[in-house]
Design a protein with these regions (language model features):
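Short alpha-helical
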Residues: 8-11, 60-61, 93
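Glycine-rich hexapeptide-repeat left-handed beta-helix
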Residues: 1, 120, 132, 137-196
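Hydrophobic, well-ordered beta-alpha structural blocks that scaffold small-molecule cofactor pockets
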Residues: 1-45, 76
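Redox-cofactor binding/interface segments in oxidoreductases and associated redox assembly factors
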Residues: 52-55, 100, 189
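Short amphipathic alpha-helical segments
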Residues: 14-16, 64-68, 112, 183-184
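Hydrophobic, well-structured mid-protein blocks that either form specific transmembrane helices
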Residues: 71-125
């Protein structure tokens, strides 16, 4: 496996893969000054390298990198990383490029899109739909049947009550409680969460 993004987030993903018995061949990064990360060589060209995970935390940046990699290498494959301590229902679906970190829980019939981050201790309950390029940050909780459109960031410790929908590229602030649907493209904070 190759990791695009020689970062702190990348170090965590490397350790997840290693804990799952998967070797990281190298990191790839655009910063020519970075030559080593977490004991691995950092390369500066990605042509022909596969399978890959994009180890960048920012949702929009991750999306742009994935698009670039697909354009450069139409045959690229993207892996999945799931920490051994994560609890993932056998009926859950996890899309390519997604990372599920230590202590996360994904329950029955949840659908996680492509290139998502389900971070440390986060929970995604039954029948949730998490769109591509979303990030459910550490200890955030989605109750049953929550729907996140593409690119949503659920901030650390935030929560969403059952059946709410959050529009694409919205940011839910740390510790916020979503009790009603939230439109796309906004930042919502507080208890209850309201767009700023």
């Amino acid at each position: 496996m190759y990791l695009f993004g020689a970062s702190g987030h990348g170090k965590v993903i490397k350790e997840i893969l290693n804990a799952s018995g998967i070797e990281v061949q190298a990191f790839i990064d655009d910063d020519l000054n970075v030559t080593e990360c977490a004991g691995c060589t950092v390369m500066h060209e990605s042509a022909g390298l596969t399978p890959m995970l994009v180890s960048v935390g920012a949702n929009k940046t991750r999306q742009k990198i994935v698009e670039r990699l697909r354009n450069e290498n139409p045959g690229i494959r993207f892996g999945i990383a799931v920490h051994p301590s994560a609890v993932v229902s056998p009926s859950a679906v996890i899309g390519e490029g997604t990372v599920v970190m230590a202590g996360a829980v994904i329950n029955a019939d949840a659908v996680i899109g492509k290139h998502c981050i389900i971070n440390t201790g986060a929970s995604v309950d039954h029948d949730c739909v998490v769109g591509d390029f979303c990030h459910v940050a550490p200890h955030a909780a989605l109750c049953g049947q929550v729907h996140l459109d593409e690119g949503v960031l659920m901030g650390a410790g935030s929560c969403a009550i059952p059946c709410v929908k959050i529009g694409s590229w919205t940011v839910i602030g740390a510790g916020a409680a979503v009790v009603n649907d939230i439109e796309g493209g906004v930042t919502a904070v507080g208890i209850p969460a309201r767009s700023k």
